[in-house]
Amino acid sequence: MTEFTTLLQQGNAWFFIPSAILLGALHGLEPGHSKTMMAAFIIAIKGTIKQAVMLGLAATISHTAVVWLIAFGGMVISKRFTAQSAEPWLQLISAVIIISTAFWMFWRTWRGERNWLENMHEHDHEHHHHDHEDHHDHGHHHHHEHGEYQDAHARAHANDIKRRFDGREVTNWQILLFGLTGGLIPCPAAITVLLICIQLKALTLGATLVVSFSLGLALTLVTVGVGAAISVQQVAKRWSGFNTLAKRAPYFSSLLIGLVGVYMGVHGFMGIMR
């Protein structure tokens, strides 16, 4: 069977480019630091669309820089393993790490939603101790406050940002600094890009894949920032599927990562068996 790197050299890299763009876009939609931090920051400072775009691009640039450093480091290390016999084992090890990453992302999302549902159930159970009028008023307030799923880390960051920046005037430099620091957090998807770049063994294709991932991430972050500037609440009211899409994004991204891992694993195993 044709080797993984040979498939890329024969012009089949087009499959990985749109996949990297999609992976970056889905990563930006996941409940986590980048999206929640940006939306909370823009809402807290009552930012403009221009400031939202600036914040999104700054976060993307810093995130891209981290991915590039990891990717180039991986490609430099991979040059030491040029022996053809070592490549299948590297593919197999990479596949195990990628599939483990996908499983961790899926499990983390599932556990977060389960804990959220349990808290909702406990909160609803407490309402039975109130009279009907009090239950109705409090239940209505509860719907607006907790009706949308958010993981614990994202909620903590949002509350901290609101406390620090609510109603304050900020400069463009502060916005850029906030975006740059917010994009430095590593992510499982970046690890996947690293492992794929190691398999590519080609600087041009590796750089293209990293840029593609960053492009997808930029599209999501800028869109989220602009959406926060023009009121995310209005978007959610007009399109009921917005919140559902955001909640399901981690499942799609974990599935995509898992498929990449399986693909690598199959080729690595076939190479070892030859």
From Swiss-Prot:
Coiled coil: none
Induction conditions: By nickel and cobalt. Transcriptionally repressed by RcnR.
Record's keyword terms, sorted: Cell inner membrane, Cell membrane, Cobalt, Cobalt transport, Ion transport, Membrane, Nickel, Nickel transport, Transmembrane, Transmembrane helix, Transport
GO CC, alphabetical: plasma membrane
Membrane-crossing residue ranges in chain numbering: 13-33, 57-77, 87-107, 175-195, 210-230, 252-272
Membrane topology (Periplasmic): 1-12, 78-86, 196-209, 273-274
Cited Pfam families: NicO
Residue ranges, annotated region (Disordered): 127-153
An annotated Gene Ontology molecular function: nickel cation transmembrane transporter activity
Chief site of localization: membrane
Annotated membrane topology: Multi-pass membrane protein
Presence of the UniProt keyword Mitochondrion in the record: no
NCBIfam families membership: PRK10019.1 (NF007454)
Family: Belongs to the NiCoT transporter (TC 2.A.52) family. RcnA subfamily.
Function, in words: Efflux system for nickel and cobalt.
Record protein name field: Nickel/cobalt efflux system RcnA
Species for this entry: Escherichia coli O1:K1 / APEC
Lineage, uppermost ranks: Bacteria, Pseudomonadati, Pseudomonadota, Gammaproteobacteria, Enterobacterales
